[in-house]
């Protein structure tokens, strides 16, 4: 597979593309299971009136922080259905925490499993889905991710 630019063709490699250019799922059947953990953190900017409504539990949609936590956990559990070529993983733990600041909300998702492949995508999906809950139509998003070893 190559990507064409105006001056040249650049070969592109991916672990999800075989030598014939076919899309493949990575074979992890020979990898030994091990304890795996990943943490992802994301931010959504909202207006000061939304921050006040969230803090005072006056949102029209109810307790949005609890709903966002549940949505994040459900999102992490559904990662293989949402993102192509992700292995379905039995999560052994998923924790979503939310922190309201003066300009928005931080969501942190930590996912854990015992298996042959990592849970980075589950943590990223969990944090992202938790942040999809917003009263305003126009919001800015800034996503940061960080992975940590399982202890």
Regions found by a protein language model. Give the residues of each.
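C-terminal binding/interaction regions
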Residues: 2-4, 10-65, 70-87, 91-138
């Amino acid at each position: 597979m190559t990507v064409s630019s105006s001056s040249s063709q650049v070969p592109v490699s991916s672990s999800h593309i075989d030598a014939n250019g076919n899309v493949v799922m990575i074979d992890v059947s020979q990898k030994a299971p091990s304890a795996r953990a990943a943490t992802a953190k994301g931010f959504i900017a909202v207006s000061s009136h939304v921050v006040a409504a969230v803090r005072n539990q006056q949102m029209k949609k109810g307790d949005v922080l609890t709903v966002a936590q549940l949505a994040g956990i459900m999102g992490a559990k559904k990662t293989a259905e949402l993102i192509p070529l992700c292995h379905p993983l039995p999560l052994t733990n998923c924790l979503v925490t939310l922190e309201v600041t003066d300009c928005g909300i931080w969501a942190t998702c930590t996912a854990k499993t015992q298996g042959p492949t990592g849970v980075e995508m589950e943590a990223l999906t969990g944090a992202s889905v938790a942040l999809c809950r917003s009263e305003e139509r126009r919001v800015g998003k800034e996503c940061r991710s960080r992975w940590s070893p399982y202890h």
